[in-house]
Amino acid sequence: MDKKKALLIVFIIILLIFLGRPILWYCMRPDGATMESREEILNDIKDGTRWTITTERLVEGYVISGAVSDRGEAMIAVFEPKENGKYKLQTATRRDKEEIIISGSIINDVWYDFIWFQGASTERAEIIYTVPNVTSQSSVYLTDNDTIICSPTTYKDYTLQVTYFDSEGNKYE
């Protein structure tokens, strides 16, 4: 009888180990509730690349993050709200830091264009939407605080031209 009890105890311990690991892994996953947690989520995207979030903004409850990597890249990441203040990565667009990132996502049934540039210190950006058979529309945004531009649009067929300007008038396209 003692041998059966010992085998039962060993079996239960082995079962707890096998069941406990996935449960522990699930509980320790980053939940996106803090900037540090969202960085962990970004660091899981690509092996070996370390991301640091440098700017964030809220758009209708979604967190839009701008991050830079240890490999000279920049990224716009969109985090979708979940229950209890948690966030899930919805989309991420990565480019070389010297390039202007143009990305987009649907938030609450509205398409948003997201634009961010890490290549130089800039003061403003001019965005021109060109729509067939419609007069082009231009908007100017201040960008002196590492701002991610979030531009809602109802256009379905359009082109987008973005030009950043620094304090000396230099253009970045």
Question: What are the roles of these predicted feature ranges?
Answer:
Residues 62, 70-78, 98-100, 124-126, ...:
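Short, surface-exposed beta-strand/loop "edge" segments at domain boundaries and coil↔beta transitions
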Residues 1-2:
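N-terminal hydrophobic targeting signals that begin at the initiator methionine
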Residues 72, 118-125, 155-158:
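Short proline/glycine-enriched turn/loop motifs at strand-loop junctions of beta-rich domains
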Residues 91-116:
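Extracellular ectodomain segments of secreted/surface proteins
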Residues 126-173:
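Ser/Thr-rich low-complexity repeats and stalk/linker segments
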